[in-house]
Swiss-Prot record:
NCBIfam families: PRK00011.1. SUPFAM superfamilies: PLP-dependent transferases (SSF53383). Belongs to the SHMT family. It comes from Phocaeicola vulgatus (strain ATCC 8482 / DSM 1447 / JCM 5826 / CCUG 4940 / NBRC 14291 / NCTC 11154). PANTHER family: SERINE HYDROXYMETHYLTRANSFERASE, SERINE HYDROXYMETHYLTRANSFERASE 1. This is Serine hydroxymethyltransferase. The gene is glyA. It comes from the Bacteria. Keywords: Amino-acid biosynthesis, Cytoplasm, One-carbon metabolism, Pyridoxal phosphate, Transferase.
Length: 426
């Protein structure tokens, strides 16, 4: 076959973009060479519908081994009794939990998307909000933190069948214990989506929801620093509370419902090359350098947030406990939208994403905020001193969004600075 130079030239362009720029998108990271090698391996050739030891195809005895290693390592990292590593993404993992727990039209609670929630937690344009009935809880307007008292009031009033914790733009620790107490009061299943802070949790730097929640989902990229994919876990398996039975009349365990929801519920064949890459990444999580890396992620985020605050920016909730922060632009730049801010920063090779902020008057296409995170830049070896420089460059760009000369100067500075940092330092 002739080499597809068109696509490989594009891949090289993307490689150069990643090398030259400062990556601050909170959900992005750089994986190790061995994770990429597993992703590009011959395992991509193998169909393996089903689970290890119970497949619908022959010749699965080898991929059974790699998938079982992924399961065992994931359980070891988070102290889970049961895990499923087959979901193709975090949203797929969430969809599988919905399928296992809810019937169409059933009510559930999730964090308001504009307050830092996620599309798959009840957005009306997502299957979670189309098939099921969402109700929202919010951040406290004064503190910018989850209002657990309001959450309890809403739960007692609405009686949801499931309560979801976790989000895509929330920089504070979650009170999983309080959430479990609320869920137990109303007889709800507590599902925690820890996609964003999973790596920090794996390193023991944030509280572990597996100890409290009925079910935990996550992506395997972001802070966890693996290939793009999803997982589902339970700290302890339990009989399903709705009395669903096997053909033999035995009460099904929750793990059986979840396994069936993933396959054949929402997926067919698993991506065994991705699962092998997940296993490699989980192995990296168990190495001592991983905790060093995650500790630096947290330090860098705290320093970047404070440096921005010192320059007059508003950070929702006043700071960060994890890898991310949500910058409310309205205080410092009342007329600047997140869309324009993102475009200007990207032009300077500082990659961020526009994001709605709590009580935002602008649409999701314009927004009044930008979301920042430190996982990717920390993987490259950045320390606190670079965070101070980044805060300065962000302010320079956002104060000159229409000045192409200033943006070009910042871009040149970014490109020169990043020559000192390899793509993967930890």
């Amino acid at each position: 076959m002739k080499r597809d130079d068109l696509i490989f030239d594009i891949i090289e362009k993307e490689h150069q973009r990643q090398l030259k720029g400062i990556e601050l998108i909170a959900s992005e990271n750089f994986v190790s060479d061995q994770v990429m090698q597993a992703m590009g391996s011959c395992l991509t050739n193998k169909y393996a519908e089903g689970y290890p030891g119970k497949r619908y195809y022959g010749g699965c005895e080898v991929v059974d081994q790699s998938e079982q290693i992924a399961i065992d390592r994931l359980k070891q990292i988070f102290g889970a009794e049961w895990a499923n590593v087959q979901p193709h993404s975090g949203a797929q993992a969430n969809a599988a939990v919905f399928l296992a727990v809810l019937n169409p039209g059933d009510k559930f609670m999730g964090l308001n998307l504009a307050h830092g929630g996620h599309l798959s937690h009840g957005s009306l344009v997502n299957t979670s909000g189309i098939i099921y009935t969402p109700c929202e809880y919010n951040l406290n307007k004064e503190t910018g933190r989850v209002d657990y008292d309001q959450m309890e009031e809403i739960a007692l009033r609405e009686k949801p069948k499931m309560i979801i914790g976790g989000g895509s733009a929330y920089s504070r620790e979650w009170d999983y214990k309080r959430m479990r107490e609320i869920a137990d009061k109303v007889g709800a299943i507590l599902m925690i989506d820890m996609a964003h802070p999973a790596g920090l949790i794996a390193a023991g730097l944030l509280d572990n929801p597996v100890k409290y929640a009925h079910i935990v989902t996550s992506t395997t990229h972001k802070t966890l620093r693996g290939p793009r994919g999803g997982v589902i876990m339970m700290g302890k398996d339990f009989p399903n509370p709705w009395g669903k039975k096997t053909p033999k009349g035995e009460i099904k365990m929750m793990s059986q419902l979840l396994d069936s929801a993933v396959f054949p519920g929402i997926q067919g064949g698993p991506l065994e090359h991705v699962i092998a890459a997940k296993a490699v990444a989980f192995g990296e999580c168990l190495q001592p350098e991983y905790k060093e890396y995650q500790t630096q992620v947290k330090k860098n985020a705290a320093v970047l947030a404070q440096a921005l605050i010192d320059r007059g920016f508003t950070i929702v909730s006043g700071g960060t406990d994890n890898h991310s922060m949500l910058v409310d632009l309205r205080t410092k730049y009342p007329d600047l939208t997140g869309k324009v801010a993102e475009k200007a920063l990207v032009a300077a090779d500082i990659t961020v994403n526009k994001n709605m902020v709590p009580f935002d008057s602008r649409s999701a296409f314009q927004t009044s905020g930008i979301r920042l995170g430190t996982p990717a830049i920390t993987t490259r070896g950045a320390k606190e001193d670079l965070m101070l420089e980044i805060a300065e460059m962000i302010e320079t760009v956002l104060s000159n969004v229409d000045n192409e000369e200033v943006i070009a100067q910042v871009r040149a500075r970014v490109n020169e600075t990043m020559k000192k940092y390899p793509i993967f330092a930890y």
